[in-house]
């Protein structure tokens, strides 16, 4: 996003946080309604262009949103959308991306209120690993010929009763409304958004064998000291690394595995 869109999204995040600080607001319902607005804006290209047209006044765009959504969504959702369309946007799709982020954030807030946010973070990571290792499942979830309804039913059969309701909802939305993203990129964005709810960063840790609780605590503390923020550790076991651990934080990789050292030694010998 360019600066105008980033500023608009930052303001919307603040409005959402202020709104959901009030525990009487139903965060899950808010998420559902914002998700429906996302689908509408993604589908109606001309509408989102009108709602982001800099030649139109913010008030006229807010009035249009109110006419379209009035009676279909609650007052809190309408207030958030009105604030969004009053803002200036660098591109019309940035508005859709932002409404979608607010929907996911509202759902994650619902999980946080229920004390289930850690479970949601872990389930998102594990689901990504399952999809990455099951080509048939990934193909079914990303097929262009399968309907959104069929994909949703498949996911509900896989996740229903086995994952937190919030996890199920946001994964179903991601798969049925991919909006041009790969499944992996979408899951990664959701994991980062979940971590941000606790002002944490995400570290993907790969080791040959499971880490002990003490090792996890020490690693988390070391990474927090290194990056200046608390870390959520997504743990992956891969015997192929042979020994040691590999840590990925964002685009940065700290690799201390035996496999990597052997590969490096081989490169040096070949050179």
Swiss-Prot record:
Keywords: ATP synthesis, Cell membrane, CF(1), Hydrogen ion transport, Ion transport, Membrane, Transport. It holds the Pfam family OSCP. It comes from the Bacteria. GO terms for cellular component: plasma membrane; proton-transporting ATP synthase complex. GO terms for molecular function: proton-transporting ATP synthase activity, rotational mechanism. It is a peripheral membrane protein. It is found in: Cell membrane. The keyword Signal does not apply. Signal peptide: none annotated. The keyword Flavoprotein does not apply. F(1)F(0) ATP synthase produces ATP from ADP in the presence of a proton or sodium gradient. F-type ATPases consist of two structural domains, F(1) containing the extramembraneous catalytic core and F(0) containing the membrane proton channel, linked together by a central stalk and a peripheral stalk. During catalysis, ATP synthesis in the catalytic domain of F(1) is coupled via a rotary mechanism of the central stalk subunits to proton translocation. F-type ATPases have 2 components, F(1) - the catalytic core - and F(0) - the membrane proton channel. F(1) has five subunits: alpha(3), beta(3), gamma(1), delta(1), epsilon(1). F(0) has three main subunits: a(1), b(2) and c(10-14). The alpha and beta chains form an alternating ring which encloses part of the gamma chain. F(1) is attached to F(0) by a central stalk formed by the gamma and epsilon chains, while a peripheral stalk is formed by the delta and b chains. PANTHER family: ATP SYNTHASE DELTA CHAIN. Belongs to the ATPase delta chain family. This is ATP synthase subunit delta. It comes from Streptomyces griseus subsp. griseus (strain JCM 4626 / CBS 651.72 / NBRC 13350 / KCC S-0626 / ISP 5235). The lineage of its organism: Bacteria, Bacillati, Actinomycetota, Actinomycetes, Kitasatosporales. The gene is atpH.
């Amino acid at each position: 996003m360019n600066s105008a869109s980033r500023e608009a999204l930052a303001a919307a995040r603040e409005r959402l946080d202020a709104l959901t600080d009030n525990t009487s607001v139903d965060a899950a319902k808010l998420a559902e309604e914002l998700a429906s607005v996302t689908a509408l804006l993604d589908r109606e290209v001309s509408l989102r262009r009108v709602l982001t047209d800099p030649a139109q006044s913010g008030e006229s765009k807010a009035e249009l949103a109110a006419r379209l959504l009035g009676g279909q969504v609650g007052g809190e959702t309408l207030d958030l959308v009105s604030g969004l369309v009053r803002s200036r946007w660098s591109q019309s799709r940035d508005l859709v991306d932002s409404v979608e982020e607010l929907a996911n954030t509202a759902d994650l807030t619902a999980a946080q209120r229920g004390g289930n946010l850690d479970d949601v973070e872990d389930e998102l990571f594990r689901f990504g690993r399952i999809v990455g290792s099951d080509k048939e499942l990934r193909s079914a979830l990303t097929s262009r010929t399968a309907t959104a309804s069929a994909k949703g039913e498949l996911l509900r059969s896989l996740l229903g009763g086995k994952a937190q309701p919030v996890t199920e909802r946001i994964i179903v939305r991601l798969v049925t409304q991919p909006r041009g993203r790969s499944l992996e990129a979408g899951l990664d964005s959701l994991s980062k958004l979940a971590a941000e709810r606790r002002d944490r960063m995400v570290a993907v840790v790969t080791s040959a064998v499971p880490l002990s609780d003490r090792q996890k605590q020490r690693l988390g503390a070391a990474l927090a000291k290194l990056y200046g923020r608390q870390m959520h550790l997504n743990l992956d076991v891969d015997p192929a690394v042979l020994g040691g651990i590999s840590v990925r934080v964002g685009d940065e990789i700290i690799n201390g595995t035996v496999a990597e050292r052997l590969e490096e030694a081989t490169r040096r010998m070949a050179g």
